Amino acid sequence: MSDINVTRLPGFVPILFPCVGDDVNTALTRGE
């Protein structure tokens, strides 16, 4: 899985990967 896919699907990612989803949300909050 690419990080791009994870950032594009923040809706279900946190459900499958709580740890990764949380990290992604933090990255999205930063704007990158």
Swiss-Prot record:
Gene Ontology MF terms in the entry: toxin activity
InterPro entries, sorted: Amanitin/phalloidin
Cross-link for Cyclopeptide (Gly-Pro), residue positions: 11-18
Post-translational modification as stated in the protein's UniProt record: Processed by the macrocyclase-peptidase enzyme POPB to yield a toxic cyclic octapeptide. POPB first removes 10 residues from the N-terminus. Conformational trapping of the remaining peptide forces the enzyme to release this intermediate rather than proceed to macrocyclization. The enzyme rebinds the remaining peptide in a different conformation and catalyzes macrocyclization of the N-terminal 8 residues.
Prosegment residue ranges: 1-10, 19-32
NCBIfam families assigned to the protein according to its UniProt record, in alphabetical order: amanitin
Family, as annotated: Belongs to the MSDIN fungal toxin family.
Function: Probable toxin that belongs to the MSDIN-like toxin family responsible for a large number of food poisoning cases and deaths.
Name of this protein: MSDIN-like toxin proprotein 1
Organism: Amanita bisporigera (Destroying angel)
Phylogenetic classification of the source organism: Eukaryota, Fungi, Dikarya, Basidiomycota, Agaricomycotina
Gene name tied to this protein: MSD1
